[in-house]
């Protein structure tokens, strides 16, 4: 069978299974999630044996230590995947919830009701844990899912797929509700992106190159964020101690994630009070600064920021720093160089905070809090499948509700239109 035929068969099976999943009772979905959590522990040795094949191949091809770390399915990773499934099982089921109801003058009762999106395709790199995490979220929201992981994790993902299928069968759900693309060839991705007849949404998770490839080649709607160029703006009347704590956390806690700060903007009237102490704190943590001319006048030992630095998602202990003349200049900088991901203002002015919230066009905008809070769990959404900087169909962290849509339901008693 050709790769194209394999993908078409997978997509058709997912579409068929979506009909059953759309009306699957909550308790049955939860049962499947809990069964999968238990089976992950039972199948741990088999999963790790397959993972070892991927790790050996990765080392032989010179994959970086960071990539190998993401690829490794340790006991802790298995426990984390199982715990995540149990957490999803405990979350409220969005399917069937009515968000608004009203009665028309002719007696028709109209409501909006949440329903699954249908078939979701997820294309991702390296991390085998995404296979289980994504499957759990999609199932709880009543969707079916086609998972295409990176070729470097093929053995691991096949093993996880077998565990998922066994759990679905045990719980009486369609085994094709979760399918892993079984071939490593990149041609499979191209064919997957052409299945608009069967797949309702594509979610890519990975580097900017992968995401741009998916967007350019997909005939199916895509939810994505290319990168996280996140900003913190320190206003003229900010509490300096608070600002330093927020900036340090936003850059240093986990510099390799998409909600880490990449550019620091400081009001000119606060720069002298803020930057020297902040720079010393960053230096102690190994953060390399790249600054504009005004920044370098205060911090002469740092590198000069080039134009490319303002666009950069470093994912490392590197930070671009710019002194701005006003909050409006900070907002303009974010509009020019930002990626619609996460932005922060540190200020004691309520009016400026509210204006910043209204003017900045990003998926999460915070006042006096770290960029690191752009996360489904931290915002009270529960688990998330990713962060979207697309405004259609979701903007920001995508939890269970964002994996559903709404339809209108109308109850009548014989009304006809005159």
UniProtKB/Swiss-Prot annotation:
GO BP terms, alphabetized: L-proline biosynthetic process
Superkingdom of this protein's organism: Bacteria
Reactions that this protein is recorded to catalyse: L-glutamate 5-semialdehyde + phosphate + NADP(+) = L-glutamyl 5-phosphate + NADPH + H(+)
Subcellular location as annotated: Cytoplasm
Metabolic or biological pathway: Amino-acid biosynthesis; L-proline biosynthesis; L-glutamate 5-semialdehyde from L-glutamate: step 2/2
Major site of localization recorded for this protein: cytoplasm
Catalytic activity, EC: 1.2.1.41
Gene3D superfamilies according to UniProt: Aldehyde Dehydrogenase, Chain A, domain 1, Aldehyde Dehydrogenase, Chain A, domain 2
Any Pfam family: Aldedh
GO function terms (MF aspect): glutamate-5-semialdehyde dehydrogenase activity; NADP binding
EC supergroup of this enzyme: oxidoreductase
A GO-annotated cellular component: cytoplasm
Keyword NADP: yes
Keywords for this protein: Amino-acid biosynthesis, Cytoplasm, NADP, Oxidoreductase, Proline biosynthesis
Role summary: Catalyzes the NADPH-dependent reduction of L-glutamate 5-phosphate into L-glutamate 5-semialdehyde and phosphate. The product spontaneously undergoes cyclization to form 1-pyrroline-5-carboxylate.
Entry similarity comment: Belongs to the gamma-glutamyl phosphate reductase family.
Name under which the protein is recorded: Gamma-glutamyl phosphate reductase
Organism of provenance: Desulfosudis oleivorans (strain DSM 6200 / JCM 39069 / Hxd3)
Lineage: Bacteria, Pseudomonadati, Thermodesulfobacteriota, Desulfobacteria, Desulfobacterales
């Amino acid at each position: 069978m050709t790769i194209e035929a394999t993908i078409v068969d997978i997509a058709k099976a997912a579409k068929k299974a979506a009909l059953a999943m759309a009306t699957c009772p909550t308790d049955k979905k939860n049962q499947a999630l809990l069964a999968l959590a238990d089976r992950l522990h039972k199948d741990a040795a088999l999963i790790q044996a397959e993972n070892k094949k991927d790790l050996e191949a990765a080392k032989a091809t010179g994959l970086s230590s960071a990539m190998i770390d993401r690829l490794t399915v340790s006991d802790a990773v298995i426990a984390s995947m199982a715990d995540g499934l149990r957490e999803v099982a405990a979350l409220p089921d969005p399917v069937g919830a009515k968000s608004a109801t009203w009665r028309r003058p002719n007696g028709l009762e109209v409501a909006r009701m949440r329903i699954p999106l249908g078939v979701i395709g997820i294309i991702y790199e390296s991390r085998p844990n995404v296979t289980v995490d994504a499957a759990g979220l999609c199932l709880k929201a009543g969707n079916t899912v086609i998972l295409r992981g990176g070729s470097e994790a093929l053995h691991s993902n096949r093993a996880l797929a077998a565990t998922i299928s066994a759990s679905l069968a045990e719980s009486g759900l369609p085994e094709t509700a979760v399918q892993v693309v079984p071939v490593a060839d990149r041609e499979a991705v191209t064919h997957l992106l052409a299945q608009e007849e069967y797949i309702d949404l594509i979610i890519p998770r990975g580097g900017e190159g992968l995401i741009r490839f998916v967007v350019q080649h997909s005939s199916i709607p895509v939810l994505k964020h290319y990168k996280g160029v996140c900003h913190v703006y320190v206003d003229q009347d900010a509490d300096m101690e608070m600002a330093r704590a927020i900036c340090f956390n936003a850059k240093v806690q986990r510099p390799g994630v998409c909600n880490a700060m990449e550019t620091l903007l400081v009001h000119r009237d606060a720069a002298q009070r803020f930057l020297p102490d902040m720079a010393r704190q960053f230096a102690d943590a190994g953060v390399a600064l790249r600054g504009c001319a005004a920044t370098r006048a205060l911090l002469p030992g740092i590198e000069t920021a080039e134009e490319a630095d303002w666009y950069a998602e470093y994912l490392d202990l590197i930070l671009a720093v710019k002194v701005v003349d006003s909050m409006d200049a900070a907002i303009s900088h974010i509009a020019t160089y930002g990626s619609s991901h996460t932005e922060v203002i540190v200020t004691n002015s309520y009016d400026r905070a509210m204006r910043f919230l209204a003017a900045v066009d990003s998926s999460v905008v915070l006042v006096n809090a770290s960029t690191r809070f752009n996360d489904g769990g931290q915002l009270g959404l529960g688990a998330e499948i990713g962060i979207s900087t697309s405004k259609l169909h979701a903007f920001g962290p995508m939890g269970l509700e964002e994996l559903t849509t709404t339809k209108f339901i109308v109850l009548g008693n014989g009304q006809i239109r005159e």
